[in-house]
């Protein structure tokens, strides 16, 4: 009888404990995509969609998500959000999304694909220029960044290193 009396409070406390969260399945490759200015969030990746899909096909099991940010340039249809505000919000969204994902899936290789303002927000998150930047394990998890039509691009500068087949991007000066 004493065993039952002692065991009952123990089992009762276990029943009231928070349920165990199911483990998330982590892909080997995860792609973050970002659309260009004036393309609605409903269009997800914008012009970068084709490339996002090509990378997913090249790496079976790879998954992706679009960065949620305004992608505005001051137009009325965007509530007048300026380009500067939009790219700052986008950069913050990148840092938050990549960091959060990396915490959940620390061994997943991350690919960033963006076009125009979408490329710029990834550029900012990697190299600085608009608020916070990726750091630590989240930065180390980024294995590829494809920035097409990036407004920050200036031909001939030292950070224009490599090609699609060799080397890569070195960090911009902050």
What is each stretch, according to the model?
Residues 1-23:
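Fungal secretory targeting signals
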Residues 36, 142-153:
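Active-site nucleophile loop of the alpha/beta-hydrolase fold
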Residues 127-140:
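Conserved hydrolase catalytic core segment
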Residues 98-102, 124, 130:
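Membrane-helix exit/interface motif
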Residues 40-43, 76-77, 120-124, 154-158:
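Extracytoplasmic/secreted cell-surface and envelope-processing proteins
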Residues 23-108:
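Active-site catalytic motif of lipid deacylating hydrolases and related acyltransferases
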Residues 150-174:
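Lipolytic serine-hydrolase domain surface
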Residues 112-118, 122:
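Gly/Ala-rich beta-loop-alpha elbow adjacent to hydrolase catalytic centers
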């Amino acid at each position: 009888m004493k065993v039952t009396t002692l065991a009952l409070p123990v089992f009762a406390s276990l029943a009231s404990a928070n349920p165990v969260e199911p483990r998330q399945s982590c892909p080997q490759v995860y792609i973050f995509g970002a659309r260009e200015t004036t393309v609605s969030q409903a269009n997800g990746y914008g012009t970068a969609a084709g490339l996002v899909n090509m990378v997913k096909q090249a790496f079976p099991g790879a998954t992706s998500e679009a960065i949620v940010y305004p992608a505005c340039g001051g137009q009325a249809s965007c509530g007048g959000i300026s380009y500067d505000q939009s790219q700052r919000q986008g950069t913050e969204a990148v840092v938050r999304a990549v960091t959060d994902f990396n915490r959940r899936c620390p061994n997943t290789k991350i690919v960033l694909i963006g076009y125009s303002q979408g490329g710029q927000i990834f550029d900012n998150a990697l190299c600085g220029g608009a608020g916070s930047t990726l750091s630590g394990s989240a930065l180390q998890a980024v294995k590829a960044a494809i920035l097409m039509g990036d407004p920050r691009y200036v031909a001939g500068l030292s950070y224009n290193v490599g090609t699609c087949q060799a080397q890569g991007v070195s960090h911009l000066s902050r």
